[in-house]
Amino acid sequence: MQDGKALQAGTSHYLGTGFAEASGIKYQDKDGNQQFAHTTSWGVSTRMIGGVIMTHGDDDGLRCPPQIAPHQIVIIPMLRDNDEDEAVLAYCRSLRLELLALNVFGEPLRVLLDTKATKASNKRWSWVKKGAPIIVEVGPRDMGEGKAAVIRRDNLYKDDGKLATAFTPRTEFVAS
């Protein structure tokens, strides 16, 4: 862990023959005799989730590795409760479809369009805490200029670049 301590990741137990006797699980030994099986139990516990959080967290929350992130890219539309909102949402839906066409780890990117009726700044902070590897913010001006704010969660670097070039290094990051 970050503090130099170890974490027991799994557990392994010898259970004897009790479960085999209760379930009637037998095998034939080398002499042809029926014997109750000796059983074991092994598993990864919920401590593993804690280990991921402790290893990949910082003061702002989780920094989820792209390989295990439920959503590798989260798109946040910057809505203003005006006539442009539907156009921004349509643009974000189109962007999501473009990103879903990209493959990383042999599968499509996992992209979420966050359409909750919450202020964009609150959504951003929520996704920073949840550890989304890449957060994309799109507002009316961005849409008109073909831009978006692309934020990497691992270093909180924000790039306000053109969409045509914004995702090549980001998808390489997701694939790393």
Can you say where each PLM-predicted feature lies in the sequence?
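NTP/phosphate- and nucleic-acid-binding module
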Residues: M1-S176
